[in-house]
Every structure is written in C-alpha cells, then in structure tokens.
A protein has these predicted regions:
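Beta-propeller fold detector
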Residues: 30-31, 95-101, 162-170, 217-231, ...
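Beta-rich, blade/repeat-based domains predominating
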Residues: 35-46, 81-82, 103-126, 149, ...
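Short, conserved, GDST-rich strand-edge loop motifs in beta-rich repeat architectures
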Residues: 53-82, 129-150, 230-251, 266, ...
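A short loop-to-beta-strand structural motif that recurs across blades of beta-propeller domains
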Residues: 81-86, 150-153, 205-207, 302-304, ...
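Short loop/turn segments that connect beta-strands within beta-propeller blades
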Residues: 89-93, 156-160, 210-214, 307-311, ...
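Blade-level signature of beta-propeller repeat domains, shared across WD40, Kelch, NHL, RCC1
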Residues: 381-419
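A short, hydrophobic C-terminal helix/tail in secreted or cell-surface proteins
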Residues: 421-441
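C-terminal membrane-anchoring or membrane-association module
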Residues: 437-461
Length: 461
C-alpha cells in the first residue's frame, strides 16, 4: 500500500458501557495525560485502571535497523525499543506496565510511530495487545529485527509475558489478500466473544482471529476507494535533504511533483481504502472507518458495516476526511473522528514537521443520518481512536502521531454548541473515576458499590 500512513495504528475503539445520566452541560475538552510518544490505544481494565499504549519514537538509526517509509517520501523508519504500555491506577498513580517494546518511527522526528497500537480486554478480564509494522513485512525479522511487530498477543500481567495469537504481517507476506503492494500495519481491533477482529491499514483487510489459539480464521479486503484523478491534489515536496528541521535525515526523496488538482505528479499512488478504526454497532455488526490513500483526498473517506460471521462488507456512509475513530453512544448514534480536517500533506511536512493546522473533528451521525460536528479544532489535533466512557463522554488519543507532545483527552459532547475547552486538571482523579466506573459497568453485580464521592469526581471534569 504505497504512500499512505500505515503508522496511524490508531487507538482502541469503543469500550461498551452505559452512559451515566447527568444534566446537560457545555461540550468540553480536558487533557488527562500529556508528554506521550505517539499514544494510540486506550481501554479500561478490570482493575479500574485506564490502560494506554504508547507506540514509541522508534530508534536513532545508529544500528542500521531502518527501512524507507512508504508513506513519508521514503524517509527512514528506524527501529528501537521505545514502545510501552502504561496505566493510570484508581488511586491516581501513573505506572509503566510494559516497557522496552519494539517501535518503528521516522528518524529523527520520532513521528508516525508503529509499535504497541491497540489494547482490549475480553469479558473475562484477559488483556490483548496489537502491534503495528508500517512497512514491508518481509523486512520485519531481518533488517528491522523486530519479530514482535505486526502481531496480536495475549498479555499475562502477572508474568509480563506475551503469547502470540496471530501474525498479521506474516499473513500479508504469504497471501497479500488485496493483491496490491506488500505492506502490513495492524491498526486496531475489536473483541466479540472469543473472536478478535483486526483491522490492518497496510494490507487493507479485516481479519477474524480466534482468541482460543486457533489463529487467523478468515481475512477479507476492503473495497478500493475510487476517486476521480482530476480531483486529486498533490504536494510540492522539497528535494531530498531540504526538509526543514531534517537536514541530516539520511535517505532520498522522490522528485518534487507538480501542484494543483490537475497537475502531473511523480508520486506512485494506488486506489486503496486504508481502514483504521473498528467498533461494535448496536445491532451486533461491526463498524469500520477508513483513512484513504495518498494524497488523502478530502471528503472521500467511507464508513462500512461488516458482518462478524461472513465478513461481508457494506458501505453505510461517506464524505469524510481521514477517519481514525468510530464509536456509538448509548442511544445508538454513531461518532466518527477525523484525524486532520484537510489532506495531511498540507499541514505536516514529510519528516514530521508541523507547518499548518492539524485540527481534527468529532462528528455525530444520528440514527436518521443527520450529521453534527460535536467538536472541531480548539485542542483536538491529529487525534485517533475513540473510547466511550461510562458517563457518555469520549476518551481520545490526541496528537497521536507525534513524539513528546502526545495526549489523552476527554471530550464531553453534552452541548456541542458551546465548544468549550477547559484547562488540564491538576490531578488525574477524573480519569481515575472513569476507570473505576468502567470496571463497575463491566461487572454489573458491583454497580451498587459506586459511591457518591466517585460520581462527584466525574462531575468535576
């Protein structure tokens, strides 16, 4: 899958839960955690903690473990052990659960990381971790020396051991389901019963994986995204070595293409879907969103419904730009997250230098098909993935493609007209409250143990 952002292995999708009834209030955005390296997946665990995957910032390339990026003018993607899994505990502590996990990112910016991508818990409380690759999977074990990338694992939190359940990257190498170029980058996954449904944005596929150790059971490719070539816009890239802030970046770049909607361009493009996000719909089907291919045409991304048994794919919505998250609220309304509202190349130079507006949007699609922008810009930037909190707000990985400045944010959609950004809380007690509430809602028999004090903490957000 050429020239597309495989490293948007973005976030865990919806954690099912009932909204806690509260009086309507202005929509607000709160920063719950900051200073992260390419944050992606979030999930509430059975212990009441909020778990967060950090894809990491890759390596410095000194050991030669680098490959050319298929999505960033072939700038080097270098491997390192900078990925991690962290959690915020019910008493407010930030802890590292797993560290020194393999990571792959642009060098030297650390942008567009691939590594620990998504996290989920099954109904029994077992943890599962998905890792991305962001490149040709045949280089994973040899050049990069990162055999753990491109796989779905079961995690033993007691021993910190990982048990491989599926090698998505190897499957792409051996099968290349969509018949296009050989690329794998598992983005996100959803669990239904004893089955995991894995979205691979590089391979353009959805895979059905048994959590019982039975492996990959079925793989289906998403339909090609056809766009009128005359409507495509292309960037004018500087020659190799002239990327601002990246003068010492090794490796080449393609010749600068022309600009404008009808310009002749030298970038190879393929019409592909690039799926990024998945969640369970109220009717028991799966809902999947796509990012789109380079040059990331605006207002072209689609949303699909997928039958969990047959993996039959049907388009249910379109007209979006670079989607990286989907979720449903308790009333059955669908929410879609736009990573950046304009084609990403207009706002971020190849190599990871932000030069423009990387604002994204959270869009509500009502059951009747009507659309409403719940939040746009104003702190929502290059975001990915949506986790529904028990009170009906959304947990999102913000600046999810950037090193050092990644965040976990909460958007409360109660009254979208106000669009109010609130300061970062002095503590993570609100986040802890979400975690505790999620745990109780997972185990309905314990709901009566939720205290008024905990609910008050949620209100303070």
């Amino acid at each position: 899958m050429k020239l597309k952002h495989f490293t948007l292995t973005f976030l865990t999708l919806c954690v099912a839960g009932l909204a806690v009834p509260k009086t309507a209030q202005a929509a607000s955005l709160s920063v719950l955690a900051s200073g992260l390296d390419n944050p992606r997946g979030t999930a509430f665990g059975p212990d009441g903690s909020l778990y967060i995957t950090e894809t990491g910032r890759g390596g410095d390339g000194a050991d030669g473990r680098c490959i050319p990026s298929p999505s960033a003018q072939y700038i080097p993607l270098c491997a390192g052990n900078t990925g991690s899994l962290i959690r915020i505990t019910p008493d407010g502590q930030r802890q590292t659960v797993l560290d020194n996990l393999p990571s792959l990112a642009l060098t030297p910016s650390g942008e567009q990381g691939a590594g620990p991508a998504d996290i989920k818990f099954d109904a029994k409380g077992n943890m599962y971790l998905l890792t991305g690759v962001a490149g040709n999977p045949t280089s994973r074990d040899t050049v990069l020396g990162t055999p753990e990338l491109g796989k779905l694992f079961k995690v033993d939190l007691n021993t910190k051991s990982l048990t491989s359940l599926a090698d998505l990257a190897l499957y792409e190498t051996e099968n290349n389901t969509d018949g296009s170029d050989l690329i794998s980058n598992p983005y996100s996954f959803e669990i239904m019963g004893d089955i995991a449904y894995v979205i691979d944005g590089g391979a353009n596929t959805i895979s059905k994986v048994g959590l019982d150790g039975s492996g990959i059971q079925k793989v289906v490719a998403f339909p090609v995204l056809q766009t009128d070539p005359s409507k495509l816009e292309f960037p004018s890239m500087p020659p190799a070595g002239e990327i601002p802030g990246g003068e010492n970046i090794p490796g080449g770049g393609l010749p600068a293409p022309g600009t404008g909607v009808t310009a002749v361009q030298d970038f190879p493009i393929t019409f592909q879907s690039v799926p990024t996000a998945i969640t369970t719909a109220p009717d028991g089907t799966l809902t999947v969103a796509e990012y789109s291919y380079f040059p990331y045409p605006e207002n072209e991304a689609r949303i699909f419904s997928v039958d969990p048994n047959t993996l039959e794919i049907k388009q249910i919505a379109d007209g979006f730009t670079q989607l990286t998250g989907v979720s449903y609220d308790a009333e059955g309304n669908l929410y879609a997250l736009q990573h950046i509202n304009t084609s990403e190349w207009k706002e971020i130079l190849q190599g990871g230098v932000v030069v423009g507006d990387i604002s994204g949007s959270l869009i509500k699609i009502g059951k009747d098909g009507t659309r409403e922008t719940i939040w746009t810009g104003n702190g929502l930037e290059a975001a990915s993935g949506i986790t529904l909190a028990p009170d009906g707000s959304f947990i999102i990985a913000n600046r999810a493609r950037l090193a050092d400045t990644g965040e976990i944010i909460r958007i409360d959609p109660k009254a979208p007209a106000d669009n109010k950004k609130v300061p970062e809380p002095a503590s993570v007690l609100g986040l802890i409250a979400f975690s505790a509430l999620a745990t109780k809602l997972r185990k309905r028999k314990h709901q009566e143990e939720l205290s008024e004090e905990l609910l008050a903490k949620v209100e303070t957000l």
